[in-house]
């Protein structure tokens, strides 16, 4: 299991306590969600076709792990999946991010309009969102708290429907239905839903662009994200990401 020091050891406990306290039957979470008309509509319209796509990709619709990577400059979210018990993820689908706010670089305070960058999980599903459906990203993590500017790092960062945003990931109502269903299916089986957010893909050309156009403190931060990014690029497996006492990311195999 991927663990991020304080983040994935403590917040994973919070997540599991919130959604499946004392090992409540896995189906109860999904059953509760399906009482909401938007979730039911998402399942009625998307789950059948998604199951066909999953089977075509040799993914068992009844038991899978999901991992998402968001790239701000590229304006995409990659959905990677694997069967439970397998070691390697495979790219399942890529979705466009409909709108953006802020600039490349991490979120450091409330109201800065920034989309966070770092290593996160989906920790809440909102079936009655003002933006159709939404899933909360567990920002701020321990690193964000340590590196915040001022007294408040901000929060309530969502992946949601519609096509407007201040610091979130808007996916349109149509695409959030698919993403919500896929993530809900994983969460319903007590599987964590990881999402990592990067400024861009760390290609050689993009690294040169970042170094040429952004201040050294941002480049230094991105250099702490890159090793875990590179590890996944090579192995298609999530490394253990750790946060040190200064809020810096590093990883272990």
Which positions does each model-derived feature cover?
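Bacterial N-terminal signal peptides
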Residues: 9-18
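Short internal beta-strands
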Residues: 196-198
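A conserved hydrophobic position in a structured secondary element of the catalytic/binding core
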Residues: 171
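Cell wall/extracellular polymer interaction/catalysis modules
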Residues: 24-166, 174-187, 193, 202-253
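Positively charged n-region of N-terminal signal peptides that target proteins for export
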Residues: 1-5
């Amino acid at each position: 299991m991927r663990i991020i020091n304080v983040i994935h050891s403590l917040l994973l406990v919070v997540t599991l306590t919130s959604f499946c306290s004392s090992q409540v039957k896995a189906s109860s979470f999904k059953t509760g969600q399906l009482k909401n008309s938007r979730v039911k509509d998402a399942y009625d319209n998307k789950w059948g076709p998604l199951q066909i796509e999953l089977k075509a990709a040799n993914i068992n619709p009844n038991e899978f792990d999901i991992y998402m990577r968001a790239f701000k400059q590229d304006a995409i979210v990659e959905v990677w999946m694997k069967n439970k018990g397998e070691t390697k993820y495979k790219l399942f689908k890529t979705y466009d991010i409909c709108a953006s706010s802020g600039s490349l670089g991490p979120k450091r305070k409330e109201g800065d309009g920034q989309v966070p960058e770092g290593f996160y999980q989906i920790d809440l599903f909102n079936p009655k969102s003002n933006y159709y459906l939404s899933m909360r990203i567990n920002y701020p993590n321990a690193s964000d708290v340590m590196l915040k500017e001022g007294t408040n790092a901000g929060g309530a960062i969502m992946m949601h429907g519609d096509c407007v945003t201040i610091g979130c990931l808007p996916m349109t109502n149509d695409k959030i239905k698919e993403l919500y269903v896929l993530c809900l299916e994983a969460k319903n089986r007590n599987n964590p839903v990881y999402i990592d957010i990067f400024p861009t893909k760390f290609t050689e050309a993009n690294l040169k662009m970042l170094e040429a156009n952004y201040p050294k403190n941002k480049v230094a931060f991105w250099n702490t994200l890159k090793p875990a990014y590179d590890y996944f690029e090579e192995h298609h497996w999530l490394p253990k990401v750790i946060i040190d006492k200064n809020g810096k990311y590093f990883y272990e195999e």
